Amino acid sequence: MKSIIVYGSQYGTTRFYAEKLSELTDIEPISYEQAAEVSGCELVIYLGGLYAGGVKGLKHALKYFPKEAELILITVGLADPADSENVKNIRKSLKKQMPDDAYKRARIFHLRGGIDYKQLTFKHKTMMKLLYNSVKNTPPEEMTAETKAMIETYNQKVNFVDERTLEPIVKEIKKMLSGGKR
């Protein structure tokens, strides 16, 4: 089964996961900017960093994915995927970004990334400051886990990257490559 890993990364954690996944599966990784190269692939694995509710490069890359290809979609962000409310919010956002048929056929996984405020672009620093200022005085009982985490990590360097979280994804890929169904 012809397969490819496509990733959209702004600050490096998504690229790290894509390269590690490549090592574990022997599937070539490419940036979403090269997405035109996916033609003929039967399995497309997309990893995208979460930024302001969107998945980096997904809209661009989806245009090139073969309609009949199997799709694994992996988001990478600060939100803890162990929190069901975070997952619900991420998936709600994904639904808005993807055609319905692509969303329905995608196997979706979520990984934690990291953030280093010193590395952020001016635009992203400004967005984070505005977001922080808009939520910092919210009563604790009204805060989501995602909001609490953002406030706790604001202006710091945090890294939640964990290679072990790739294990279920590798298992799913190997199952698909051996002809296994959902």
For every predicted segment, state its role:
Residues M1-E68, K171-R182:
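N-terminal beta1-alpha1-beta2 submodule of the flavodoxin-like/Rossmannoid cofactor-binding fold
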Residues G53-R182:
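FMN-binding flavodoxin-like domain, especially the glycine-rich phosphate-binding loop
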